[in-house]
Curated annotation (Swiss-Prot):
Protein name as annotated: PiggyBac transposable element-derived protein 1
Keywords of this entry: Isopeptide bond, Phosphoprotein, Ubl conjugation
Native species: Homo sapiens (Human)
Record carries keyword Mitochondrion: no
PTM-bearing positions, type Phosphoserine: 360
Protein origin, superkingdom: Eukaryota
CC terms in the record's Gene Ontology section: membrane
Residues joined by cross-link Glycyl lysine isopeptide (Lys-Gly) (interchain with G-Cter in SUMO2): 218
UniProt cross-references to InterPro entries, sorted A to Z: PGBD, PiggyBac_TE-derived, SCAN_dom, SCAN_sf, SRCR
GO BP term (any one): regulation of transcription by RNA polymerase II
Length: 809
């Protein structure tokens, strides 16, 4: 906003006015500090005034007191020094005299030094009341006044009154029928208020309402009392400190009928331009009169775009010795050819509406009193996260210990399910019905008579499972007799029937597809699989989150460091043994949901989604492990707020300037050496360890102790016994292989039959994963007499082909 400069200005004949622009960050800083202090004060009062009668017993009373104290002091956000400062501040405010306590408590204080500053300001009575402006109307009595123009809304200007300033409220006159008439008479008292808005918003076109001029006058005594009551005590200490440092100089002179100049006593002085008759009338009555300009009959309205452009021209001027004049008039009788040739005091001067810039050479006074203001620099992006504070100590996690009982696995053990029943926990009747219905719907849309049944669909799945451990170059060879006699397949389903069903296999309605989802044709099946996987997943403490690959040479996705490097990338959350709990095919980062946090990135938001999936089973302290693609200090802080523990390797550019030992320097140390730091605000540890190589890890739950002794190999593959290994490294090594174990199991007996549809490879992947999960449950339910993955798959494939053979005839 623009605000009148309270300091001296050069005196010249053009009546130029110098104003300053307020800092637009005032309101944001004040609102955030006042809101935080207000919330903290409420928590303190609730803690101090808590009554024993509010609880139902001593145990509950103690728990509520502890919770209220936690909400007040917030130990997870404040250090010990900050908590001590809060307690000292509270006691300091308590011992103050009663007449000072109400004055001090109106400020959002955060430390004792701020309270002392407020008390000193109250005692000395010195304080900056903001940048203010007033207007003197020339006349016999010279009453100080401030003009307020009704109908004008300048978003770039805000004036605040000095104590004791009389206000004048003016509105433009109606279009006169003859000569201008003088306006006089008593007027009720009122105060002028100008709207204060952001200076970067678009300027609003000033418009004067065609109403008769009205004048509101206050005496100096009444105005002084009103302003003294409000004063500036409502401003916070931070806002007052900012008042003198964030102003930008601009120029403005509002003179539809008058000129405004800055006098040496720092007050606006309005010079009234009237005719000789009106001057005589003003002298006789002893009251200042304002000239009412008639409407120009042949004037041309000024376009809104032009008005806004002129306002923006003045607003964007660089500070310095810049002085400008702005003439604002009603758009109803404003034109670009407004002149003052008919006025006796200034016949030669011609000025256009909202135009005219001049530079004052008389700037010696300003240079003596004010420092040079540099041009506005480009704003740098400021992170919303506070600066990290690192300390070298071990972590002290406050997570509860793991004590959950897996009742679902106990029920499966008691039921003693066979491999087929375990597989159908995931491909249940609901899933088969979904596939059958969508396949028949798709075939009918193509005018194909199919009418496939659930029994036939199970036969098709039996052939697909059989192809995983009995491979042929062509799928037609499963029905040949010459050298690959497969009576089991021939008796189960005819070749042409299999080809017809397999070519029309479908999983979603083409009439209701989400174009933003790349895998919309598989989305119903993916949701059904994720629901069943989570329903029967073992309830464990540790889980692994990583990337997997579904082999497909038509894909342009590449993943280095995996057995399968080309295909579809899939995000997987598994147990430490390889049971898949949740998966999601990779899509571009542009497909992220609106409610996801952009600061966490794609990998961080995927981990948060997996954590939410686990928390659906219960609020347990799960422990997630993942690699450096996902890990960041912000992610571990967000997981800690959800009550989820996490550990992972971290990249160098995500350590938040943690002062760990340099990698090159650590290579000169002995193997087993490690360095670590704690982030004090969120209690997150970073550790760099030199073992087989140098790795950096981050955790919100596991620290250094206990330190273990392990063996490793050097560069020549020679074993080095007994080197130190922190506990954080041990936990990560034990939990990081979950996804790799799943990939290893399903890679041995993958489904080999594929169709021409691009998503058939993903359907085969889901069948293999369901078989892996069923085998994991089989091994957990029968630890001593379990089948290996091959025998388990053969059992399911033979069952589907044998028990549904007669249905295809």
């Amino acid at each position: 906003m623009y605000e009148a400069l309270p300091g001296p200005a050069p005196e010249n004949e053009d009546g130029l006015v110098k104003v300053k622009e307020e800092d637009p960050t005032w309101e944001q800083v004040c609102n955030s500090q006042e809101g935080s202090s207000h919330t903290q004060e409420i928590c303190r009062l609730r803690f101090r005034h808590f009554c024993y009668q509010e609880a139902h017993g001593p145990q509950e009373a103690l728990a509520q007191l502890r919770e209220l104290c936690h909400q007040w002091l917030r130990p997870e956000m404040h250090t010990k020094e900050q908590i001590m400062e809060l307690l000292v501040l509270e006691q300091f405010l308590t011992i103050l005299p009663k007449e000072l306590q109400p004055c001090v408590k109106t400020y959002p204080l955060e430390s004792g030094e701020e309270a002392v500053t407020v008390l000193e300001n109250l005692e000395t009575g010195s304080g900056d009341t903001g940048q203010q402006a007033s207007v003197y109307i020339q006349g016999q009595d010279m009453h100080p006044m401030v003009a307020e123009y009704q109908g004008v809304s300048l978003e770039c200007q805000s004036l605040q009154l000095l104590p004791g300033i009389t206000t004048l409220k003016c509105e433009p006159p109606q279009r006169p029928q003859g000569n201008p008439q003088e306006v006089s008479g008593p007027v009720p008292h009122g105060s002028a208020h100008l709207q204060e808005k952001n200076p970067r918003d678009k300027a609003v076109v000033p418009v004067f309402n065609p109403v008769r001029s009205q004048t509101l006058v206050k005496t100096e005594e009444e105005t002084a009392q009103a302003v003294a009551a409000e004063k500036w005590s409502h401003l916070s200490l931070t806002r007052r400190n900012l008042c003198g440092n964030s102003a930008q100089e601009t120029v403005m002179s509002l003179s539809p009928m008058t000129e405004e100049i800055v006098t040496k006593d720092r007050l606006f002085k309005a010079k009234q331009e009237t005719s000789e008759e009106m001057e005589q009338s003003g002298e006789a009555s002893g009251k200042p009169n304002r000239e009412c300009a008639p409407q120009i009959p042949c004037s041309t309205p000024i376009a809104t775009e032009r008005t806004v452009a002129h306002l923006n021209t003045l607003k964007d001027r660089h500070p310095g010795d810049l002085w400008a004049r702005m003439h604002i008039s009603s758009l109803e009788y404003a034109a670009g050819d407004i002149t003052r040739k008919g006025r006796k005091k200034d016949k030669a001067r011609v000025s256009e509406l909202l135009q005219g810039l001049s530079f004052s050479g008389d700037s010696d006074v300003e240079k003596d009193n004010e420092p040079e203001i540099q041009p506005a620099q480009k704003k740098l992006k400021v992170s919303c996260f506070p600066e990290k504070s690192w300390t070298k100590r071990d972590i002290k996690p406050n997570f509860p210990s793991w004590s959950a009982l897996d009742s679902g696995l106990l029920n499966l053990k008691s039921e003693k399910l066979n491999p087929v029943e375990l597989f159908e926990l995931f491909f249940d009747d609901e899933t088969f019905n979904l596939i059958v219905n969508e396949t028949n719907n798709y075939a009918s849309q193509k005018n194909v008579s199919l009418e496939v049944t659930v029994q036939e669909m199970r036969c098709v799945f039996g052939v697909l499972l059989l192809s995983g451990f009995m491979r042929h170059p062509r799928r037609e060879m499963y029905w040949e007799v010459s050298d690959t006699d497969q009576n089991l397949v021939r008796d189960a389903i005819r070749r042409d029937r299999f080809e017809l069903i397999f070519s029309n296999l479908h999983f979603a309605d083409n009439g209701h597809l989400d174009q933003k989802d790349k895998f919309t044709k598989l989305r119903p099946l993916i949701k059904q699989m994720n629901k069943n996987f989570l329903l029967y997943a073992p309830l464990e403490e540790y889980y692994c989150f990583d990337k997997s690959m579904c082999e497909c040479f038509d894909s342009d996705q590449f993943l280095n460091g995996k057995p399968i490097r080309i295909g579809y990338k899939i995000w997987c959350g598994t147990t430490t043994q390889g049971y898949l709990v949740w998966f999601e095919p990779y899509q571009e980062e542009s497909t992220m949901k609106v409610d996801e946090d952009p600061d966490l990135g794609l990998g961080g938001n995927l981990v948060m989604n997996f954590a939410d999936v686990l928390l659906e089973r219960g609020q347990y302290p799960y422990h997630l492990c993942f690699d450096s693609f996902f890990t960041s200090v912000k992610l571990l802080s967000a997981l800690k707020k959800k009550g989820v523990r996490a550990t992972g390797t971290i990249r160098e550019n995500r350590t938040e300037k943690c002062p760990l030992m340099n990698v090159e320097h650590m290579k000169k140390m002995k193997r087993g050496y490690f360095d670590f730091r704690i982030e004090e605000n969120n209690e997150i540890i970073l550790c760099r360890w030199y073992g087989d190589g140098i790795i950096s890890l981050c955790s919100n739950a596991v620290g250094i102790e206990p330190v273990n002794e392990v063996s490793c190999c050097d560069a020549d593959n020679e074993e080095i016994p007994q080197i130190s290994q922190p506990s954080i490294v041990k936990v990560y090594d034990e939990c990081k292989e979950g996804v790799a174990k799943m990939d290893q199991i399903i890679s041995k007996y993958r489904v080999r039959i594929r169709s021409k549809k691009w998503y058939s490879i993903l359907v085969s992947y889901m069948i293999d994963v369901a078989m892996n999960n069923a085998w994991q449950l089989h091994r957990a339910c029968n630890p001593g007499a379990s089948l290996d993955p091959l025998d388990f798959r053969r059992f399911v494939a033979h069952f589907y082909l044998e028990h549904n053979a007669h249905l295809s005839d």
